[in-house]
Amino acid sequence: MNEYINLDEKNINEEHICCAIGDPKHQAGVDKKKEWIKNKFKDGHVFRKLNARGKIFIEYEPIETAWVPINGKNYEYIYCLWVAGSFKGKGIARELLEYAIKDAKDKKMSGICTLVAQKKKPFLGEKKFFEHFGFKVVDSIKDYELMALQFDDKDTPKFSDSARNMKIDDKDFTIYYTNECPYVEYEVNELSEYAKKKDIKLKFVKIDSLEKAKNAPCIINNWANFYNGEFISNTILNANAFEKLVKWKN
């Protein structure tokens, strides 16, 4: 039987958070992620992981306090469900999701939801996997979709009106981000240095509050790229990827 651990205020300092394990360059991001989680425990934030060294976890919380531009009532929102490497194909993802579903039902929630895409995108769940458990598409913006598993006939969550814009006024390269992902902090610093070195106009907009998250101008789980005012992707970029993007756009 697999052994799982739920992070809480007592164990979070000692436990790893699955991503960026043992990589010193991401330690600042890990620290910020842990602080972010600590501040979310009061909202009912759940981080459940396999008791092993690897990326094997699910993370979710009530939609009312989830840092995403999605509005709803009495639903859980899954930020991330990730099972990587040699742990794939062993039923662990199923066990993690089934735990979250049961947890939501035990809390008398109306359902549970998550963000996917019509075609697989980095840092988003796989649509087919959630379909297997009965999740259905309840809203969409371009090729991004909100899937929900309903427990009753009450209203399902929807993307906020602001997210439907998928545009901003600024024409320079602009990146919106949160500290929900431990990889983000290093890439923000790396891209800042790269843009300065190459004399490229690059702006960062940090989403550091629930209000900012709910009113984000696009689909975002933890990162969003804009150029010429248009949303490009949700992919977290390093310097090499950003360089290719700049060349492609120019």
Set out the residue ranges of the language-model regions.
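Conserved catalytic-core motifs of GNAT/GCN5-like acyltransferases
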Residues: 115, 131-148, 232
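Short amphipathic alpha-helix that is part of the acyltransferase structural core
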Residues: 1-51, 161-162, 181-183, 187-190, ...
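Conserved beta-strand in the GNAT
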Residues: 49, 53-65, 77, 82
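Conserved beta-hairpin
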Residues: 42-59, 225-230
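Conserved GNAT acetyl-CoA-binding A-motif
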Residues: 104-120
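Non-catalytic, surface beta->alpha helical segment in thiol-disulfide oxidoreductase systems
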Residues: 228-250
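C-terminal "cap" of GNAT-fold acetyltransferases
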Residues: 142-165
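Conserved acetyl-CoA-binding loop-helix of GNAT-fold acetyltransferases
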Residues: 83, 89-104
